[in-house]
Structure formats: structure tokens, C-alpha cells
A protein has these predicted regions:
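Acidic, low-complexity/disordered tracts enriched in E/D and polar residues
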Residues: 1-43
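Long, charge-rich, low-complexity alpha-helical segments
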Residues: 31-94
């Protein structure tokens, strides 16, 4: 995390559905039929990514809303974005 931050957006074909209790949900890629279950913190990050966010904003969300150290939040966000990119569920732009 340094220099120019990439702003990540969920691709337009993504649908998010939270569980009734709000403790998680599912992500559906309506083109490939990929379905991913997500816990509460992942759903919070996915909600932010709908409108676009850089990794710093995602880290801030984890450290402010969950008892997560900065080091852990950075690692978790890096891994989270890597997974989303590998499934082609996010697009990034400078």
C-alpha cells in the first residue's frame, strides 16, 4: 500500500444478498454463476466496493468496525482483493 492507490469496483454483473440477520451473505456473479459465501466483515467490504474504494478505505473499515490490528487488516485486505481479482469480480483503476 503506497503511491497511487487503485480504486476497486465490483463488476456490474455482481449481486450481493445479505442474510436476514446481517451476519453474512452471498455474492453472485450473474454471468458465470459463481457463488461465494461471505462473512459479515467480507459483506461490509463488498458493500463498500459497490461504489468503489481503495485498499486504504477497506483497511480503515476493518480496523474501525472490528477488533483487527492494522497489520492484520492490511494482510486481510490484500488477500481479499487477490481472491476477488482472481475470480474477475473486481475492476481497478488509478
Amino acid at each position: 500500500m503506497g503511491g497511487e492507490e487503485i480504486v476497486w469496483h465490483l463488476t456490474g454483473r455482481i449481486r450481493l444478498d445479505r442474510s436476514p440477520g446481517g451476519t453474512g451473505g452471498v455474492l453472485l456473479d450473474t454471468t458465470s454463476a459463481t457463488i461465494c459465501s461471505a462473512n459479515e466483515s467480507a459483506m461490509d467490504l463488498l458493500d463498500i466496493l459497490r461504489n468503489g474504494a481503495d485498499s486504504h478505505s477497506l483497511v480503515d473499515k476493518l480496523t474501525s468496525d472490528y477488533q483487527v490490528s492494522l497489520r492484520r487488516a492490511v494482510a486481510d485486505v490484500d488477500q481479499f482483493l487477490h481472491q476477488l481479482k482472481s475470480l474477475r469480480l473486481v475492476d481497478g483503476q488509478d
